[in-house]
Amino acid sequence: MKVVHVVRQFHPSIGGMEEVVLNVARQHQANSADTVEIVTLDRVFTDPSAQLAQHELHQGLSITRIGYRGSSRYPIAPSVLGAIRSADVVHLHGIDFFYDYLALTKPLHGKPMVVSTHGGFFHTAYASRMKQIWFQTLTRTSALAYARVIATSENDGDLFAKVVAPSRLRVIENGVDVEKYAGQGARAPGRTMLYFGRWSVNKGLIETLELLQAALTRDPQWRLIIAGREYDLNEADLRKAIAERGLQDKVQLSMSPSQQQLCALMQQAQFFVCLSRHEGFGIAAVEAMSAGLIPILSDIPPFVRLATESGQGVIVNRDRIQAAADSVQALALQANADFDARRTATMAYVARYDWRHVVGRYIDEYHAALGTPRTQEAVR
């Protein structure tokens, strides 16, 4: 069986969706006799002037890149039809042009397809009314072309249940590479919060600065590290926001750190903070917990579930910063007494997200789309 993953951004782009595709494809190929390939766009959205190689091998995976026109919100790339010609099954990632176009052209290409939702297109409030109309019409219609719609979180499952029949909807929560940062967090209690991920308004970074400002009135030892890559906030934007709040001595910025550099930053921190407005799943939070970082998270459904099930960390309302700072300070005081136990429990909880436990469910869906039984040895 040959599975071709179609995703708008992949290596060298870094992000949650890219990480999911890499791990599904890598685990599948490493543990079966199947062939797995990636089809993606030939430019990274954050550096559109640099055209990438048409073909590349990355971590043993064959990548084919195709050109596009239009915006990063809805990049138009009809040449995807040629790129999937050799596939037995096509696995789409995200609800975007590829999703709509491959559904529309299914009578031409005839490929069995599954799609993973990755939060749909509701990550920001941008054009929210138009998005709802699109979702209820075009997204609903396009879904009919897919053998399975795979919701990547319970939150997505609830959302897509509005437009997809229950018989064709499955929830398969993302796995996470829990070995990558395992145990890298600080081993002694302290007052350092770490955020890592995209520098985006959606991620609540300005509110995170306000939380730090409020926390400092309760304990002057608090520090914040913001690591990641520029998105709709750049380094100048963040430095300006930091200076406006007088936090220059309390915030460290690390732009585009390597994995090794991020591990070094984790070793300085006790807490992971993310005040996102929306997450399909929240991979970074799980990665942080695998490092032993205690989570400080916004009150969105995937984060509430993570904190509730793990029994670790604290959920805060980013619109009530003073109350949030009280909760964070109380958490830190409690952690002074039992930090090692909290750290250990946090790491133990996320072991369930290991990709080894997840990839078999995807392979089951590929076989279901093909109408072929899966043999016991499909995953070793």
Swiss-Prot record:
Transmembrane portions of the chain: none
Record flagged with keyword Metal-binding: no
Enzyme Commission identifier(s): 2.4.1.252
MF (Gene Ontology): glycosyltransferase activity
Domain of life: Bacteria
CDD domains reported in the protein's UniProt record: GT4_PimA-like
Enzyme class (EC, first level): transferase
GO biological process terms held by the UniProt record: polysaccharide biosynthetic process
Keywords recorded for this protein, A-Z: Exopolysaccharide synthesis, Glycosyltransferase, Transferase, Virulence
Keyword Glycoprotein: no
Catalyzed reaction equations: beta-D-Glc-(1->4)-alpha-D-Glc-di-trans,octa-cis-undecaprenyl diphosphate + GDP-alpha-D-mannose = alpha-D-Man-(1->3)-beta-D-Glc-(1->4)-alpha-D-Glc-1-di-trans,octa-cis-undecaprenyl diphosphate + GDP + H(+)
Family membership: Belongs to the glycosyltransferase group 1 family. Glycosyltransferase 4 subfamily.
Role description: Involved in the biosynthesis of the exopolysaccharide xanthan, a polymer that is comprised of repeating pentasaccharide units with the structure of a beta-(1,4)-linked D-glucose backbone with trisaccharide side chains composed of mannose-beta-(1,4)-glucuronic acid-beta-(1,2)-mannose attached to alternate glucose residues in the backbone by alpha-(1,3) linkages.
Protein's UniProt name: GDP-mannose:cellobiosyl-diphosphopolyprenol alpha-mannosyltransferase
Taxonomic lineage: Bacteria, Pseudomonadati, Pseudomonadota, Gammaproteobacteria, Lysobacterales
Gene from which this protein is expressed: gumH
